[in-house]
Amino acid sequence: MFLILFTLQIAFLVSATDENHSDSEKKLVPNLTFKDFNNKKVKLDQFYENGPILVNFWTLSCEPCKKEMKHLSKLNTKYSEYGFKVLSINMDSPRTLKKVKQFTKSQKYTFQILSDPRMELFRKLGGSVMPLVVFINNDGTIESRHIGYNPGDESLLEKEIIDIISSNSSDSQIQNLKPLSNEIIVE
């Protein structure tokens, strides 16, 4: 039974890894309110109003999520000077929040982490499998989604980051941005 479920999940991940939207069908992301780890309320548009963002959804029990987040932290540092940000949304229940805070503090992530225990945004964006990454333009439209994580996916995400930075800027230097390396880190 486990093998059947695992096979079905892999088949779903392979078929749904990259979903790009044409301009005519781009959807606006709902502007929901979340709490950060200091219990401060923040709205989603505060993050994308100054540049494009990558939103990743995760839980503490999702090992692929945690592997992906290491790479997202590096990409956030690398591309933040271009107005790009990574925003992480944890969907664990409030009773595990202390463990989530301890984990994120130990990892020293370079991006903001918000809490959405009801998985409201995840569901509104059609999420069903984690990790889920959603690229959002600075006008609030959803550029693309990536479902699941396999070693090497960080290179695909980096290319998408460069594309979204370039398409959201008129600066010719930014439009010619290239990955600094094609290095793939296998863990």
Give each language-model segment a name.
Residues 2-11:
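Bacterial N-terminal signal peptides
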Residues 15-45:
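N-terminal "domain-start" segment that seeds a small globular fold
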Residues 44-63:
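Short active-site neighborhood of thiol/selenol oxidoreductases, capturing the structured segment around
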Residues 54-55, 86, 133:
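Hydrophobic beta-strand anchors of alpha/beta hydrolase catalytic cores
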Residues 66-107, 117-123:
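Structural microenvironment flanking redox-active thiols in thiol-disulfide oxidoreductases
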Residues 102-109, 117-162:
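Thiol/disulfide oxidoreductase modules built on the thioredoxin-like
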Residues 166-187:
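Non-globular targeting/processing and membrane-anchoring segments
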